[in-house]
């Protein structure tokens, strides 16, 4: 089950039907990762820089906003509460503008990135980063989104 909390109302102005959009991304990813049948509960909070900066400071001691924060709660098992993913619209807008990509594509990427973190993937070491990015690229491709790690013309 995907629980979606729209903390920052501006999401409605930027993403068409944000709840349906989020469910499509997460469910497509869970199916492709062969874990949909576990029926995990995942909470997604559509937030802003203010909340992400507060959480980033509280949990990571970094006093600045960020694009996505993930909080894993349980290892994957049937019907578990897997974790929470928080995304900041403000940061995603700035980054997608800088990258010259649609906000929907960048949001999809960050949601998948956050999902992989709550599934215990990380990018601390080069091999881990390669594995995580490869999975992101594959999942984004399923959604019709180009590889975000290939430099684009601006």
Curated annotation (Swiss-Prot):
GO terms for cellular component: cytoplasm. Its EC number is 3.1.-.-. One of its GO terms (molecular function) is RNA endonuclease activity. It is found in: Cytoplasm. Zn(2+) binds at residues 113, 117, 123. Transmembrane segments: none annotated. The keyword S-adenosyl-L-methionine does not apply. PANTHER family: ENDORIBONUCLEASE YBEY, CHLOROPLASTIC (PTHR46986:SF1). This is Endoribonuclease YbeY. The lineage of its organism: Bacteria, Pseudomonadati, Pseudomonadota, Alphaproteobacteria, Rickettsiales.
């Amino acid at each position: 089950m995907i629980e979606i909390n729209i903390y920052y109302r501006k999401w409605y102005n930027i993403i068409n039907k944000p709840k349906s959009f989020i469910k499509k991304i997460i469910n497509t990813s869970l199916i492709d990762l062969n874990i949909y049948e576990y029926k995990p509960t995942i909470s997604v909070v559509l937030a802003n820089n203010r909340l992400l900066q507060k959480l980033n400071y509280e949990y990571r001691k970094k006093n600045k906003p960020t694009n996505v924060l993930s909080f894993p709660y349980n290892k994957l098992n049937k019907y578990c509460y897997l974790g929470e993913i928080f995304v900041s619209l403000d940061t995603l807008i700035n980054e997608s503008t800088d990258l010259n990509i649609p906000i929907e594509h960048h949001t999809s990427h960050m949601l998948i990135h956050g999902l992989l973190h709550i599934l215990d993937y990380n990018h601390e070491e080069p091999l881990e980063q390669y594995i995580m990015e490869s999975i992101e690229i594959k999942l984004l491709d399923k959604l019709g989104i180009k590889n975000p790690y290939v430099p684009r013309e601006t």
